[in-house]
């Protein structure tokens, strides 16, 4: 009879319909297990209203005794690790033989069962290959345990800093694949889940690796399950636990966003590149904080190879290293809005994780990145001489979460940048045109100056040739004195341009004090002529040598000042005419002396012009006059 009654739901009690299917006798009475385990018979209207609960992801419930047996009563030998949320033990389920990781949450400040189960349901919805899968839970009495899949390879921290004897270090491609997988998991939490899940505790110890180094993120979405939420003492200890990974806004007490996770991911990526811990107290004081140590290196691309992990032995593409450092530097920006989206980081790392030696190709389309600043930064890092792309604080605005607003802002920025580039290019073209015009004008002016100089030189040569033709005739003493006077005037004009007023004043005073001398020659004594002519020839030869030295000095002085100036041209012409006139004067003087000796009948006076030792012809007259006077006095 009882069996017959059990076949019909109308004879079953309400309590029996709501009874759970599992044999967990230690659960509290206020837990409604039918949310997870629907009744066997669902023919009533009440069960139809619970159809949404049937669509919940399957989450298995465990009793405490079963999990204690799986972990050997939570022995120390089964302990995998300990964090801010509690301890993690390795266990084996006796029913299936499956290896699991049992996380025993701290008992202090626990939520009620309803809140705990709501969070468990939200965790069960998060399914991704790069996330550790939640298998079940336990809520017996005051016990709160979570059961996850077991990842056999250990954590990224173990492979970077706690290598076993004989274990090979990870190569460059493996490290980039780990970074790419972690970025995929983080991108799922940020963009594929509504509302977005903020990791809050991303670090190397929370990235688990399987036997093939496939990364899986753990401890995600547990911030609401965190015991002691609201307790300032506990929160401060949590900050200390993640010190070195936490974003600057977290330490300032600001609200956390998805960009805070991007900063933590940048620290992990920097650890993969350098092989250094985020905080290492064994290093010198200026190298204990990894981010603070790396910030100056970001500005010097030549030092990028030096910051790479020595265990890599430089077995990586230099271009790929530069691009990885560029991505890291963007993730570690001080301002949250200046950091890239994790989706763009994921796309960039997808190319770096490939088995290529060229890094990210330059032909990656702009549409691959949601934020165009990432593509610009990577294109700038195509060579080894480009510094990391950094967005200034002035350009950083309050970016909205929607992609349409960010795209509009980026388009406006691009248009402004294009306009600025066009304006700068136009200015450069104008400057080049003006420079070419000025060069043409200068060339034409120089050609004109050369033509004028040549014409003046030709005129000077013509005048010198005409004067040489006329100098063949005998000129009187007055004509000779007039020529000497003209030479004195031209030379004084030249010297006035080169010397200062003091020298000119001293020269004029010297000229005023000197007097002209006259000598008379005895026409009756023939034997004196030969001695006098000999001394005069010797003096003329000495004067010629002195005059040549003075001419060379004048030429060097005239050519060293300004070659293209009209003043220099006139100085050259004066020097050339002066040289020609001096040669004519020498010839005329010799003919004049021969005429004096041949006539021997008249006394002639020679006019000497005193120029304070500056004019060669004047000094010659003074020397000759004095010698002739001395000879005449001896004969008398």
Curated annotation (Swiss-Prot):
This is Receptor-like kinase LIP1. GO terms for molecular function: ATP binding; protein serine/threonine kinase activity. Interacts with PRK6. Residues 413-431, 522-531, 554-566, 588-603, 619-636 have a biased composition (Basic and acidic residues). The modification Phosphotyrosine is found at residue 250. It comes from Arabidopsis thaliana. Residues 403-434 form a coiled coil. Disruption phenotype: No visible phenotype. Lip1 and lip2 double mutants have a reduced male transmission. SUPFAM superfamilies: Protein kinase-like (PK-like) (SSF56112). Keywords: ATP-binding, Cell membrane, Coiled coil, Cytoplasm, Kinase, Lipoprotein, Membrane, Nucleotide-binding, Phosphoprotein, Serine/threonine-protein kinase, Transferase. It is found in: Cell membrane; Cytoplasm. Involved in pollen tube guidance into micropyle. Participates in perception of the ovule-secreted peptide signal LURE1. Palmitoylated.
